[in-house]
């Protein structure tokens, strides 16, 4: 609300207009005083309206500015914390990415090493298979030779017995 003392003090501080001076002079004449008063009163109303608007906006600013400043500082702090958190998360992501890359490289080297071991074992298994195949063949030949030797020995024994028996 506007206080009349404030309006009067502001109006008293306004520079004297020639229109106001003429109203003061015309007030001595009679009728022109009434026209001058209506003219001045409309100007006074405009000045009062603009003054009221200024005082209203100043009052609103006075009321709203401290909370807005407080909110502004809190917002700055929040943005600062968000930036710090974002930077920390970015660093952690980079560390994880680096560790993932390192782990992937380790895994790939393990895969290569195990593949080499597997091919080596496969070659050894093929070599063992070939040797067992040859050994089986030799064993079959040896068994066949022993069988023939045994048959010859039996035949010789039978032949000797037949020679001894015929005497």
From Swiss-Prot:
Residues 1-11 have a biased composition (Polar residues). Residues 102-160 form a coiled coil. The keyword 4Fe-4S does not apply. Disruption phenotype: Viable and fertile. In the neuromuscular junctions, results in abnormal tubular endosomal compartments and a reduction in early endosomes which leads to a decrease recycling and recovery of the synaptic vesicle pool and results in failure to sustain neurotransmitter release during high-frequency stimulation. Does not affect synaptic morphology or basal function. The keyword Iron-sulfur does not apply. Transmembrane segments: none annotated. It comes from the Eukaryota. Keywords: Coiled coil, Cytoplasm, Cytoskeleton, Synapse. It is found in: Synapse; Cytoplasm, Cytoskeleton; Cytoplasm, Myofibril, Sarcomere, Z line. Residues 1-38 are annotated as: Disordered. Component of the biogenesis of lysosome-related organelles complex-1 (BLOC-1) composed of Blos1, Blos2, Blos3, Blos4, Dysb, Muted, Pldn and Snapin. Interacts with Blos1, Blos4 and Dysb. Component of the biogenesis of lysosome-related organelles complex-1 (BLOC-1) involved in pigment granule biogenesis and membrane trafficking in synapses. In response to high synaptic activity at neuromuscular junctions, plays a key role in promoting efficient synaptic vesicle recycling and re-formation through early endosomes. This is Biogenesis of lysosome-related organelles complex 1 subunit 6. It comes from Drosophila melanogaster. The gene is Pldn.
């Amino acid at each position: 609300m506007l206080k009349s003392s404030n309006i009067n003090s502001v109006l008293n501080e306004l520079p004297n207009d020639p229109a106001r001076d003429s109203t003061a002079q015309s007030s001595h004449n009679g009728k022109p005083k009434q026209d001058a008063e209506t003219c001045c009163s409309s100007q006074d109303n405009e000045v009062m309206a603009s003054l009221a608007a200024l005082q209203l906006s100043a009052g609103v600013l006075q009321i709203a500015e401290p909370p807005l400043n407080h909110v502004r500082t809190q917002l700055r702090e929040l943005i600062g914390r968000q930036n710090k958190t974002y930077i920390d998360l970015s660093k952690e992501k980079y560390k994880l990415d680096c560790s993932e890359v390192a782990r992937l490289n380790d895994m790939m080297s393990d895969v290569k090493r195990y593949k080499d071991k597997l091919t080596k074992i496969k070659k050894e298994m093929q070599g063992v298979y070939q040797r067992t195949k040859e050994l089986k063949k030799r064993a079959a030949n040896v068994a066949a030779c022993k069988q023939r030797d045994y048959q010859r020995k039996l035949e010789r024994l039978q032949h000797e017995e037949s020679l001894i028996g015929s005497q």
